[in-house]
């Protein structure tokens, strides 16, 4: 039996799509030196090559892919978007605007200089910024621009061609820039990180290990009684001195949870809860009595929960003001926009921040009720909310504004992005509404992006050979300029206008470019995770601005003549 693979793929769009995805994902795992190609560029390259052989898929799959992707981008940005936009993120907002705005203007200028069409120009901007949201926003706006079908087809083909030719240029140049640009300034990042660590009391260890608290029990001996000198637990401040707190006391056979007025007596058996290193550092006076193994005394349910910050008495306050240790709880992690932040008493909490807290189950529940809610540990997605807001986004995208002879439509990209932001924001405020497990969100977002990349590659593949010969050299120059010049402008603006700490500034610059590999290099250079503060500050707003940039470049282009 002979099977014609070409006929088989041409006759089955679904099979072709998944063949492209599988081959592209395999290619994306390859590395060029220390740089991994990545899933998007792998799928795009494979789809372009197959597109040259005249394979194609239904455009409905491409449209659904980009819609799912951009909606999920909005959902991820939602919890922190408004807090960054309206409150303490002025510097981060300005940096993101400078980065995206300067890249947009430079791309427009180069496009006109080289005589490209809007498709090549927008694709070059998306690739140089390594930003799929730009590609998605531009593609959607082109489809709703009302231009002739032949021009539209050419523009869409050139859009994906420009992206494919400049993506690796943008990625590699930014990674190289992240490695060497910090060395060109007068203050190295490690010094900057240490400086802000001293000012704010930050934990600078980028590789900080997180341990769960453990319980050990001791019998109170004469040295501990002498050390307490009749003071109650509140006056002693056991946690401040030892890193452990007393969770239970057994006295005369009676087990009790002590309050701050309790005074230790000879023969008491106490259960101490703390991290392993805190137990190891205990003063001998606390351990001079015999360690005991009392099952009832040690029988506590220590849990680790992720608490989402929501309540007004926590939002806008500093971590130190929560006084978690006074309530017998231990803070393990602070996560903002999926970025782990340094453990810093002076970090101001935003709505939607996630605190990973360990302690007795009862105490953790009390803390969660005070500052927000415990994140749902469920694998069930609220599909009703997902679908409802998706529909709302599509309806918003249908809105068109008419100005004399000029009409402007919001478009599906902007509509779905806004609807996704609202769903993410409401989810951060209402624990039972719109829940989407992070794994499910990542999967839908990544799948939508890969389907979109496969579609644009297959549709543009037939013209890639001609495109390479005509604009290959120009694309190389333009890609480098659009990738690096906005970074330099952003650095000068942040360093000399905003006067930001360099470690925070470089993190914020990488966040404005939404480039995680470059962020890792900045953290390695600083030998600290402090740049993550800046990265998280600009990341959410930059994703939104980049999508809008893709829309704006298409709208502005006709007016430039």
Swiss-Prot record:
Domain annotation RCK C-terminal: ranges: 200-288, 292-373
PROSITE patterns, sorted: RCK_C
Keyword Transmembrane helix included in the entry's annotation: yes
Swiss-Prot/TrEMBL keywords: Cell membrane, Membrane, Repeat, Transmembrane, Transmembrane helix, Transport
Membrane topology value: Multi-pass membrane protein
GO cellular component: plasma membrane
SUPFAM superfamilies the UniProt entry points to: TrkA C-terminal domain-like (SSF116726)
Transmembrane segments: 8-28, 32-52, 66-86, 94-114, 158-178, 383-403, 406-426, 447-467, 475-495, 540-560
Localization of this protein: Cell membrane
GO molecular function annotations of the record: monoatomic cation transmembrane transporter activity
GO BP term (any one): potassium ion transport
Keyword Translocase included in the entry's annotation: no
Superkingdom of this protein's organism: Bacteria
InterPro entries to which the protein is assigned, alphabetical: AAE_transporter, RCK_C, RCK_C_sf, Transp_YbjL_put, YidE_YbjL
UniProt-listed PANTHER family: K(+)_H(+) ANTIPORTER SUBUNIT KHTT, TRANSPORT PROTEIN YBJL-RELATED
Protein family (similarity comment): Belongs to the AAE transporter (TC 2.A.81) family. YbjL subfamily.
Protein's name according to its UniProt entry: Putative transport protein YbjL
Species: Salmonella gallinarum (strain 287/91 / NCTC 13346)
Primary gene name: ybjL
